[in-house]
């Protein structure tokens, strides 16, 4: 298993404070135009911005889903982060300290990308690069799409250094960038066949323990888990 100590120096894990940011509709529209210019140029497509804002924002979402982890300019990251962080603030941040808990454990239903936990856990695939299907509603897509292109770039660096696909039941960590959380912990759950096996259970248990151990290694105080492998990977939720 490729451990934190082996990749922590090839990505930036330093947390930087973010200031409150409110963008006008005109500012958002201008950022979308500039981002689309870059993304369309990469795709060798012609730029045309007569669309309403929501259509342009959805185009950005889909294009970023499909974009390979190639380098991007500092200017692109600057304007992307402004737009995405303003959207995070508009969506509202849920303070994990306000969620009722028992024995330091809480069950909460909602959008995990709104939680300000020290880390949120992403149910990833073994490429660890996020979902490439435009506008797909899986948690992997949603987390990458709202955090920003930096997450895919960081994961690509980790995977390049690791030299192989991510084993199921392990975990990796990146910054969360434009999410309210500080970090994202990425873990790959078991893909269940016709019935759940003991190996499936062992691997799923490993996802949770590996994530918790990584959080402990990073000295994090709160971690938010989504349900791992209960979607298209087929692990029955009632067995969790």
What name fits each language-model region?
Residues 1-240:
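Macrodomain-like recognition of ADP-ribose-binding/processing modules
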């Amino acid at each position: 298993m490729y451990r934190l100590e082996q990749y922590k120096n090839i990505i930036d894990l330093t947390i930087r404070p973010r200031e409150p940011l409110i963008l006008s509709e005109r500012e958002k529209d201008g950022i979308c135009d500039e981002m689309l210019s870059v993304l369309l140029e990469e795709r060798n497509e012609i730029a045309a911005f007569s669309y309403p804002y929501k259509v342009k924002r959805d185009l950005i979402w889909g294009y970023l889903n499909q974009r390979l982890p190639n380098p991007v300019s500092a200017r692109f990251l600057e304007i992307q982060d402004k737009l995405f962080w303003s959207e995070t603030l508009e969506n509202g941040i849920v303070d994990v300290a306000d969620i009722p808990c028992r024995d330091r454990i809480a069950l909460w239903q909602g959008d995990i990308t709104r939680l300000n936990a020290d880390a949120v856990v992403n149910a990833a695939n073994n490429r660890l690069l996020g979902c490439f299907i435009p506008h797909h509603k899986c948690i992997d897509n949603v987390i990458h799409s709202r955090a920003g292109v930096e997450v895919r770039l960081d994961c690509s660096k980790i995977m390049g250094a690791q030299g192989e696909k991510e084993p199921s039941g392990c975990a990796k960590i990146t910054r969360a960038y434009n999410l309210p959380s500080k970090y994202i912990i990425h873990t790959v759950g078991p893909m269940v066949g016709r019935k759940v096996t003991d190996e499936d259970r062992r691997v799923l248990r490993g996802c949770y323990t590996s994530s918790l151990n990584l959080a402990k290694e990073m000295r994090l105080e709160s971690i938010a888990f989504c349900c791992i492998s209960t979607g298209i990977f087929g692990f029955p939720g009632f067995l969790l």
